[in-house]
Amino acid sequence: GLVISTGERPVSTISSEVHLSYRIRPLSHHFSFIHAVHRIHRNRPGKRVLTPASSNRVTLTLPSDAATTMLASGRRLAVRCRPSARLASSQPLAAPADPDGLSPPARRLVDLEDRHGAHNYAPLPVVLARGSGTRVWDVDGRSYYDFLSAYSAVNQGHCHPKIVGALAEQARTLTLTSRAFHNDCLGEFAEYCTDYFGYDRVLPMNTGVEGGETALKLARRWGYEVKGIEENKARVLFAQGNFWGRTLAAVSSSDDPEAYGGFGPYMPGFSSLPYADPAALRAELERDGAHICAFMVEPIQGEAGVVVPPDGYLAEVKALCEQHRVLLICDEVQTGLGRCGTRLCSDHDAVRPDVVVLGKALSGGVLPVAAVLADDEVMLTVRPGQHGSTYGGNPLACRVATAALEVLREEKLAENAQVRGRHLREGIEWLRPKGTSGNPRGARAGASAVGCDCDRGRRGGESGVGCVSHHVR
């Protein structure tokens, strides 16, 4: 049977047929629709019970709001239910005019963005207005479980009270000084961050892509000053399928035509190798290791579709880099900070990268904060005037980032991610029809990042689930 509770007000006071369209949201970004005809019957004051005109035994309890859980044919799905028409006869009224099913307030906001904003994104037709923990609400008050987590930027949950409290308290005191002066927050953040991750120094920036750029500048500088590479000859290796941003340096390292097409000329000194292929890395290091200063890699590739390398991959990469005196840069912007069941995803292979790039959840999603971690040999190659940011290391960001790291530690969110990750993969596997392909790929043994390969030959598979990630709270 199917039971949906939708609020307090009755759907209709008439007694006839009602045509309903159910918008079903599985664990993906894609929708399917079921249209059914039901007859209305009085049940008790304030409620109406609808039964189908067909022989299928389905019961709907429909007084008004919207979201709940649907149990049908043994499959649990998140669902939205809204009458597409209310009838005083057997003839349905006209369907809603909005092609995306948006309310007038939501449509107005979407149109404003479309009319005045750049068209560099194609969002889903949902206009969010509020968030708390694992849930978000749209402008019409409907709630959703957030399975995207702002690309892992809200690992601590939306609007975590401790992080928001730190933001509000510091915002009333001092927000920005620039690095022309010391401030009373940067030193404390630097101490906490370096102690937490076990590095000599941290260089704070604003966004993940700035962190990546910073790591590359450090690597090149180290290559010239420490390794002794001839000036302007330093090379950096990347993995194919990488994604770390959309600046010119980032797209220069990309092999995605959508990312780099039409933006040349590109940054020199960048080369890419197959991901999770130590043999390819070994061959390139043996061929030209004297000119290679760094290999930058994601422990698990996110944008490429949650691509998980074999166990031991990073350990083998680290050994090769040490053998050829090449820095290992781990891009932990998306995989770090508890998302994969450990502080850093590289911890799964017991690897300590030479340079670590952090971002996204470093602020719990309340403002942009990024950081680069390294030891003295690498970090101290950059001197005053050679790198910086007006907002990097500002008091507001430092207080927020410290609070965000404290939440990760105090609430044991990395450990919780292991438990939630197992639950998520088990649930997705339970939803998958028997005999079909599309097993969920878990990010390591326990993690809250999961990818699903969908069978394109089956109905709905052409859209499928690209990447499903679950909060660690």
Which sequence ranges carry the predicted segments?
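Ser/Thr/Pro/Gly-rich low-complexity, intrinsically disordered segments
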Residues: 1-2, 11-12, 40
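Low-acidity, Ser/Thr- and Arg-rich intrinsically disordered low-complexity segments
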Residues: 5, 9-16, 21-23, 28, ...
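Compositionally biased, intrinsically disordered low-complexity segments enriched in Pro/Arg/Gln/His
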Residues: 23, 39-42
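Intrinsically disordered, low-complexity terminal segments enriched in Ser/Thr
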Residues: 32-34
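N-terminal mitochondrial targeting presequence
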Residues: 37, 53-94
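Conserved N-terminal phosphate-binding loop of PLP-dependent enzymes in the Aspartate aminotransferase
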Residues: 88-473
